[in-house]
Amino acid sequence: MASTGWARRGFGAAVLTACAVLLAGCGGDGQNASASQGPGGGCPSAWLGGELGAGSSVELLVAAGPTIPGGRWPAYRAMADAVAGCAGAGTSVTLRPITDRSLTELPLFSAAVPEQTGQNAVNPLRYHTDLRGFVVREAAAVDRLPEVGKTATASDPLGALSAAGQSLRLGATGSKHVVIAIFNGWQQTRALNLFSYQRDPAGQTAAAVRSLRAGGALPDLGGTDVVIVGLTADVASMQTSDAHLAGLCRFWRGVVEASGGTLKLCAAALPGIGDRG
């Protein structure tokens, strides 16, 4: 897999704002790319802010270590950090790394966006300090991702989706469930290796779903909105083209729907956040 080629940055670095390039076959609705303000600070994606309403439960799954495509880390980091800035008050955010052991990887971060209630309602300084702390802690956890799973030899986003589904079932009832997965679109494990379907991943969706279901490896995403971004074209080492990415989007739509979820977006980037680092 490609190396990360990433560089550390200060917390105040500007988020890229070029429009997202949506891939054929998996368009999303409400692609308003104008900036908005979430409780956690500046929200660079109005679309994302609309998805992460107050009191939601959010599982953020992000490629880690060698599963990050070369040159893509700045964009991946910007999208991951945007979740903290766009999430509504009271929204819980859990960050999980995507590695070759995604199902058993412990979360790197789990906390709720502070609400303006109790002492925070009468002390604005305390409230904004708490908000700032939430955003800073989430960003620090995101910055650890390139060093997580450095020896990984495969990528298991399905395992991360399964872990997210399990966590959401055990969480607060009545809240909106959202999974945001940021990775290159490929699954490479013994249970499912999409590289074997490289020419036409979408054409193998039904067979893959049957195999995953029979093996108990199909995630439980009932009632969950799923966002998949970070898909990367023009990767010479993986011979990935835009047509391949469109096929990957159709594949993941089939898997998510078979798991009981709804694929809201499948694209190179979140609307409002640059698709290139």
For each predicted feature, which ranges?
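A cross-kingdom marker for long, charged
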Residues: 236-277
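Bacterial N-terminal signal peptides that target proteins for export
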Residues: 1-15
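Short beta-strand-loop
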Residues: 99-142, 193, 243
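Von Willebrand factor
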Residues: 51-118, 121-175, 178-180
